Amino acid sequence: YMRF
C-alpha cells in the first residue's frame, strides 16, 4: 500500500 502507499506508505504502509
UniProtKB/Swiss-Prot annotation:
GO CC terms, sorted: extracellular region
UniProt keyword annotations, A-Z: Amidation, Neuropeptide, Secreted
Protein name per the record: FMRFamide-like neuropeptide YMRF-amide
Native species: Hirudo medicinalis
Record bears the keyword Secreted: yes
Keyword Secreted: yes
Annotated localization: Secreted
A biological process from GO: neuropeptide signaling pathway
Family label: Belongs to the FARP (FMRFamide related peptide) family.
Domain of life: Eukaryota
PTM-bearing positions, type Phenylalanine amide: F4
